[in-house]
């Protein structure tokens, strides 16, 4: 916030990226949302019942992954820890498209084999900043965007061919 106050996070779960709702928790969440909407809109308009998803997993079609190189040289992919530049490794998030997760894992391995320098937010040194993947459920198309700190991407054709060999879709 501009006035110096910290913004409180609504999500109090210990690891919001990896947390998955049980069916019962999901139903309670829908009831809570219904109650909140009825409170907010009572007197203005009738509130139709909130319709939940039949399968509330693997629906997110946009996946973004950050990378970090550990001291032992291993490259991990994941999300930034809240309020830091520290990357927390995540695999198999229950709301993100499974194809995108597999591509991120393979890209992480390709970065290691191509000896790519992972960008360090604190030092400002490195090449690979993050990867964004969009999937289209209707067409099956997948778009991979590699965000770099420089317009020069060494061995970009070889890297793209290696990725296409692993994921021709």
Predicted regions located by residue number:
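Accessory RNA-recognition modules of RNA-modification enzymes
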Residues: 1-169
